[in-house]
């Protein structure tokens, strides 16, 4: 993260190697992000892209495919000159981790390309592949010596999901750390590329009005919501083996939670920030099986209409097992065992096929003493929320009470809202630009470390175990296009609380 936007420096010359270059992720996010960086003059002076896939094609065929993807998914109008210059540096290599000689050919191609284009031997390997290919690909990179740093840097970018449970996450970390050092691994979470997410630390620690009251003495509870309108679609096979908890909680929601709840880092650097984030995840209480079932909600969507689209029952989705117990919605109540947050519940929820698309963090402050308002309309006091909106718009909103004009003391809730777009000019982006740029300059402050990954999985493992033992018992339903299952409201109602209403 660059502190001064005017001080951004060009990354060192490098080769950018994309495994899974023919896939959706490359076309939809990675290449549009590289294009935006090129448009902002934030790519290295000497730069080349090497696309890797299992099925062969020519350099020109790959360039045509990537250009088509740019025109379809770019977040800003495509300048032909910029696109041409970017795509001219693209070459293709056919390689498969199951075919070791193909990785020898990849190494030879990179060696030759680096001599010709003077990229200095620096290499960024981006795994835009299915998770099953992560470890085999890393092993081949290690076997061929392509991760060795001999006067040049070598970095590996890995997409989520990073494991499917605590055991698999530990195993994958173990595999990677046999091959390379922790500083070479960039576990990417695109949520951290969003400006509002990055601004959470600034909001907390750069404003004297917030940090003194950011604790159990003044905060009643915190809600973290990630709602999606889309159903599972054509990803039934993947999703049925994953579910909402595995797909969203250990990464996206825990990243938001750790930024909101972490202690102030000693310094604003990668080691200090990542250590505090891992520490807060380690401090999440581990519930018993009975407590895990009581503190969680899981549900599947039934058929319904969202806009003009008819959404079928989740269990009738292609490649979903007829009697599936995989959740498309999850809500959790979590507690943190430390001095700052003792007794403050964190309510997390995420789901698919819901009536709204939104991502937000809502901090509910404790109610002020009401004795001075005796005899007035105190029942109309609204809740004091500080809400950090991440999607669909990036906002910070403060909800508080004020007197309605008139002779009597009547109180109502009012809002102050800050919208990023009203104050700062920013070109539309994918959210990946900052992350890819940081990978190239070697700033890993926005990327997860092995201990943080494992702490996240350790925190959700009790829920996974409890659900597995419960089988289909406890699976609720909700209609597609609704606000989710009624039992999610009950999770808070038992504590005398309610979810913040979408406005």
Whereabouts are the PLM-identified features?
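Secretory/organelle targeting and membrane-embedding segments
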Residues: 1-158, 162-503
């Amino acid at each position: 993260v660059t502190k001064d936007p005017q001080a951004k420096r060009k990354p060192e010359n490098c080769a950018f190697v994309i495994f899974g270059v023919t896939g959706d992720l490359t076309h939809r996010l990675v290449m549009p992000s590289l294009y935006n960086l090129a448009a902002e003059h934030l790519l290295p002076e000497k730069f080349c892209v090497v696309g890797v896939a299992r099925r062969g094609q020519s350099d020109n065929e790959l360039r045509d495919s990537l250009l088509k993807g740019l025109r379809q998914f770019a977040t800003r109008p495509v300048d032909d000159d910029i696109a041409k210059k970017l795509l001219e540096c693209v070459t293709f290599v056919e390689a498969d981790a199951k075919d070791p000689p193909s990785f020898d050919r990849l190494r030879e191609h990179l060696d030759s390309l680096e001599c010709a284009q003077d990229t200095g031997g620096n290499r960024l390997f981006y795994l835009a592949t299915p998770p099953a290919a992560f470890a085999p690909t890393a092993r081949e990179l290690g076997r061929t010596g392509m991760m060795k740093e001999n006067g040049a840097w070598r970095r590996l970018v890995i997409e989520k999901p990073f494991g499917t449970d605590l055991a698999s996450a530990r195993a994958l970390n173990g595999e990677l750390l046999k091959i390379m050092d922790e500083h070479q691994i960039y576990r990417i979470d695109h949520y951290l590329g969003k400006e509002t997410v990055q601004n959470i630390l600034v909001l907390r620690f750069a404003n004297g009005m917030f940090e003194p009251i950011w604790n159990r003495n003044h905060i009643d509870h915190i809600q973290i919501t990630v709602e999606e309108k889309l159903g599972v679609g054509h990803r039934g096979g993947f999703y049925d083996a994953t579910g909402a908890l595995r797909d969203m909680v250990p990464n996206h929601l825990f990243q938001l939670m750790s930024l909101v709840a972490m202690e102030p880092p000693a310094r604003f650097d990668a080691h200090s920030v990542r250590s505090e984030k891992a520490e807060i995840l380690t401090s999440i209480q581990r519930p018993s099986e009975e407590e895990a079932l009581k503190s969680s909600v899981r549900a599947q969507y039934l058929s319904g209409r969202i806009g003009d689209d008819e959404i079928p029952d989740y269990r009738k989705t292609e490649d979903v097992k007829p009697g599936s117990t995989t959740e498309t919605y999850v809500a959790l109540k979590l507690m943190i065992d430390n001095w700052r947050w003792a007794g403050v519940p964190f309510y997390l929820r995420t789901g698919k096929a819901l009536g709204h698309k939104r991502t937000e963090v809502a901090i509910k402050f404790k109610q002020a003493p009401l004795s001075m308002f005796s005899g007035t309309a105190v029942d109309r006091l609204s809740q004091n929320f500080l809400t950090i909106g991440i999607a669909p718009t990036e906002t910070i909103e403060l909800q508080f009470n004020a007197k309605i004009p008139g002779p009597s003391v009547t109180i109502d809730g009012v809002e102050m809202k800050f919208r990023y777009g009203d104050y700062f000019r920013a070109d539309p982006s994918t959210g990946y630009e900052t992350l890819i740029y940081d990978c190239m300059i070697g700033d890993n402050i926005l990327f997860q470390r092995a201990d943080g990954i494992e702490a996240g999985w350790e925190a959700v493992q009790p829920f996974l175990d409890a659900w597995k033992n419960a089988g289909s018992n406890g699976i609720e339903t909700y209609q597609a296009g609704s606000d989710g299952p009624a039992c999610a409201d009950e999770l808070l109602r038992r504590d005398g609380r309610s979810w913040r209403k979408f406005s």
